């Protein structure tokens, strides 16, 4: 029996995933008190997956019209569109391989792999985010 089999503390990829999921929990707690509280009605397993999805959505929104847009406002050559593209591509890569250096993307990829969330569901979300880069009033 290996040492890993006798310890309850995760190691390796499991430890990294646990840290990523804690980061996602911080995102939801900081950005949406009501949504964070609502997730407490869910079971622990479901709650974490909802947090992982919420965190990815929240960060993508920050790239488009939140903190990133604010930070890049005075930066010459700033291109939020390319930031969204890179975020999206990293998301696909992480879903495929099960790892990202971006903790929020890593946590989302863990959920996507567990729940069978594929590109056909992810891509429309990122397309929607891109519309916020150009369209400020939505009629639909």
For each feature predicted by the language model, list its residue ranges.
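Acidic catalytic motifs of isoprenoid enzymes
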Residues: 1-140
């Amino acid at each position: 029996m290996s040492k890993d089999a006798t310890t309850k503390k995760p190691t390796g990829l499991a430890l990294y995933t646990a840290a990523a999921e804690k980061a996602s929990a911080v995102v939801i707690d900081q950005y949406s008190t009501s949504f964070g509280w609502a997730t407490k009605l869910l079971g622990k397993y479901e709650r974490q997956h909802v947090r992982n999805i919420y965190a990815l959505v929240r960060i993508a929104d920050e790239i488009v019209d939140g903190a990133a847009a604010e930070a890049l406002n005075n930066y010459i050559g700033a291109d939020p569109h390319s930031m969204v593209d890179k975020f999206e591509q990293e998301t696909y890569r992480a879903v495929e391989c099960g790892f990202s250096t971006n903790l929020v993307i890593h946590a989302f990829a863990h959920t996507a792999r567990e729940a069978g969330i594929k590109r056909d569901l992810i891509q429309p979300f990122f397309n929607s985010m891109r519309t916020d880069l150009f369209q400020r009033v939505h009629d639909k």
